[in-house]
A protein has these predicted regions:
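Catalytic cores of PAPS-dependent sulfotransferases
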Residues: 155, 160-176, 207, 211, ...
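Phosphate-binding site of ATP-dependent enzymes
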Residues: 115-197, 238
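Short catalytic/ligand-binding loop motif for oxyanion handling, primarily in non-cytosolic enzymes
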Residues: 58, 79-81, 95-100, 109-113, ...
């Protein structure tokens, strides 16, 4: 039964009966995020979406005193791309791993989306040209940033925290070489299945409580019920990657996970509303928005 199909008398019973039935079927992460997207359509923007921009996100993270990769201050056409080692090449306006390349050396380059090695700089440019021709990358505008390594020859794994205003709900750990694998974690350190990537799971390394606390603290500084905070794991600490207000394929979680994350979202909305009513100012966020004239 979908949430909109639950009759009012059942909702009423859930609120009034001494042995009230659970109303958990009434919530859905998928549905709540859909509503959030409709809010964005109607209002033009939302607080978390203002951070869905690398320069803005990096400025926010710098305000908080956290580490981020070095990033070029300009974008490049493919023909103008500087030949450098130990860099990441990304589409300037892209998301996900399409068009992303890890350049360890001029003859040691990894195509992140295809999970394969590109043999030379010339082959790299051919592959990028193909990305443009097929529409994988929309515009011939590329950015360059520091290559973060987990150790001397292993690219950083991705650590993605699904944050619900001050509380991490789920954690996704991803390794991308030699092939892409995924591991879902709860905040209590249990590996779980969520319905996403069930055929591509591995036993990850997990995260520390300090790392969970870091994600919790950042999300408390953003006036939004949900945002995913993505990091790269370097040798000694997490390095900020990006804010993701709308995770890809968020409709693929199984029903149990979708319902549970719906509860997380709904509780977060309540906590955020209470904090706003109590006058919370979100100083770092508002200061940045004022600086940027948003």
């Amino acid at each position: 039964m979908h949430s909109e199909d639950i009759p009012e008398f059942m909702i009423r019973a859930g609120l009034t009966d001494e042995n009230s039935i659970s109303l958990s079927p009434a919530v859905s992460f998928r549905a709540l995020l859909n509503v959030r997207m409709r809010q964005k359509q109607l209002t033009g923007t939302l607080p978390e979406w203002r951070l869905d921009n690398k320069p803005v996100a990096y400025s926010f993270i710098e305000q908080l005193g956290l580490r981020k990769p070095w990033t070029s201050s300009e974008t490049y056409k493919l023909a103008e791309l500087p030949e450098k080692e130990n860099i990441v090449i990304k589409p300037a306006d892209g998301a996900g791993s399409r068009g992303v390349y890890l350049v360890y050396g001029f003859n040691d380059i990894v195509d992140m989306k295809r999970s394969k090695n590109v043999g030379s700089w010339e082959q790299l440019k051919d592959s990028m040209e193909q990305d443009l021709e097929t529409g994988w990358v929309q515009h011939d505008e590329w950015s360059v940033e520091e290559l973060i390594l987990e150790n001397d020859n292993t690219p950083a794994s991705d650590i993605k925290f699904y944050c619900f205003y001050g509380k991490v709900g789920l954690i996704l750990e991803i390794v991308r070489v030699p092939e892409r694998k995924y591991c879902w974690w709860t905040v209590t350190g249990e590996r779980v299945r969520t319905g996403k990537y069930d055929e591509e799971l591995f036993k990850g390394k997990g995260v520390t409580q300090d790392e969970i606390d870091l994600a919790n603290d950042i999300s408390l500084k953003i006036p939004a019920p949900f945002v995913r905070i993505d990091f790269l794991r370097s040798g000694d600490r997490l390095v900020f990657g990006e804010f993701t207000p709308k995770p890809g394929n968020y409709d693929e979680f199984d029903d149990a996970t979708d319902q549970w994350m719906g509860d997380c979202f709904t509780e977060a909305q309540g906590r955020l509303t209470n904090d706003l009513l109590l006058g919370k100012q979100f100083e770092a966020y508002n200061q940045l928005m004022k600086t940027l004239n948003y």
